Amino acid sequence: MAYVLVGFMGVGKTTIGNLLARKLGLKFIDIDEQIELEMNMKIKDIFEQYGETYFRTLEHNILKQHINMNIVLATGGGIIENPNNISLLKENKINIWVDTNINTVYNRIVNDVNRPNAMNKSFDAIKDLYFRRRSRYNEIAYISVNNDDELSDCVQEIHNFIIAEEGN
């Protein structure tokens, strides 16, 4: 069973996932990084050449391949755009929704050329997407954590939760 990090782009899933995996002594896989590795292309180039639908299929295949492994797995913010992913994630025991303030998110992603769904978007457009996705993150989350403050506190909160769950 994977410990799956879900949440909007720019909330810190990859950074948290790396730290959490080290703390738990597990392998860490970031789905976006895995796609880039397998395709030998950047996400933005996959979007440009093949489109979002193709990217979402790749994303689903990576999720399906790794969700039953004992790892920490970071998803892309749009993982919940595919209903098949929602189904897979609902079957997984521990999905961790990482959230943070929309202003913080916007400042992190607004000029990031590696985020095709954020490039050249206004604050209102990003905010609309953020709020549209929130209910789906909540639907699949077993626990939610806020990454507004210290990163180490967020990682420790998740770690404590996992240790407590393993004891039950």
Swiss-Prot record:
Q: What is its main location?
A: cytoplasm
Which key words tag this protein in UniProt?
A: Amino-acid biosynthesis, Aromatic amino acid biosynthesis, ATP-binding, Cytoplasm, Kinase, Magnesium, Metal-binding, Nucleotide-binding, Transferase
Task: Establish whether keyword Metal-binding is in the entry.
Answer: yes
What note does UniProt attach to the cofactor annotation?
A: Binds 1 Mg(2+) ion per subunit.
Which EC number applies? 2.7.1.71
Report any one BP term from Gene Ontology.
amino acid biosynthetic process
The terms describing its cellular component in GO are: cytosol
The pathway noted for it is: Metabolic intermediate biosynthesis; chorismate biosynthesis; chorismate from D-erythrose 4-phosphate and phosphoenolpyruvate: step 5/7
Q: Where does ATP bind?
A: 10-15, 115
Superkingdom of the organism of origin: Bacteria
Q: What is the protein's given name?
A: Shikimate kinase
Q: Which organism is it from?
A: Macrococcus caseolyticus (strain JCSC5402) (Macrococcoides caseolyticum)
